Regions:
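Secreted/periplasmic carbohydrate-active enzymes, especially glycoside hydrolases
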Residues: 1-221
Length: 221
């Protein structure tokens, strides 16, 4: 059975019907895509919420005004990569072909899926939805891109110093005072943050300020 290479040169459509409540006043709804390869258009109830480009980019789309009470229809259009390459199993006898790097021209993606000297080409180039999709509700405040950094004074591994960063966003048109709580091994630390309307701030928890973040006898990987 020959699998055609045209699979990576055409659009693909995903369609899902789901039931959801409509956000109440002061709340928001977000459609979150953890990973799509390589380009996509996102449609909810016949409204285009936006686009995504890049296999390792997350997409978050405000669905607050587009959800209906009851059945909703989510449609995702996957567009083919601009430079899909040509599958060609390289060997001393077959010579070199346009594989093993052509997908890099588009940006970070699964570059070996076009074929290499150690793998045959994947005919659809692994395009499609490859990570989870969520519908998330917020209550006027949203956290973004939380990062945890661990420092060990190697070769000593008896204490780990942990630094946590996160972005806090006020989605409301009024000022907000927000408590950001961090729970580590059952111990909680808190920072109070004042946010102007629609403001976004970086909050950092460091072991210099919060001694709880000096973790003794850490469980090493």
């Amino acid at each position: 059975l020959a699998i055609p290479d045209t699979l990576c040169r055409m659009d693909w459509w995903y369609r899902l019907e789901f039931n959801s409540p409509v956000p109440t006043e002061g709340r928001e709804a977000w459609l979150v895509f953890k990973g799509i390869n390589y380009q996509a258009e996102i449609w909810l109830n016949d409204v285009c919420l936006g686009t995504m480009k890049g296999a390792f980019i997350r997409g978050e789309f405000n669905a607050t005004d587009h959800l209906v009470d009851g059945k909703n229809t989510l449609v995702v259009r996957i567009l083919p990569p601009p430079n899909p390459g040509i599958p060609h199993e390289q060997s001393p006898s077959a010579g070199n072909g346009m594989n093993g790097g052509q997908l890099c021209l588009d940006g970070p993606t699964f570059i070996s899926s076009e074929g290499w000297d150690w793998v045959p080409g994947i005919r659809d180039r692994n395009i499609g939805i490859w990570q989870d999709v969520h519908l998330r509700f917020t209550n006027g405040i949203r956290l973004h891109d939380t990062q945890v950094v661990t420092h060990l004074a190697l070769p000593d591994t008896t204490v780990a110093e942990i630094t946590v960063r996160t972005e806090v966003e006020n989605l409301q048109p009024i000022a907000k005072q927000v408590s950001v709580d961090l729970n580590l091994e059952g111990k909680k630390v808190t920072q109070e943050v004042n946010l102007a309307p629609k403001e976004r701030k970086t909050v950092v928890f460091t072991p210099d300020v919060h001694k709880t973040l000096e973790l003794k006898s850490p469980r090493l990987w």
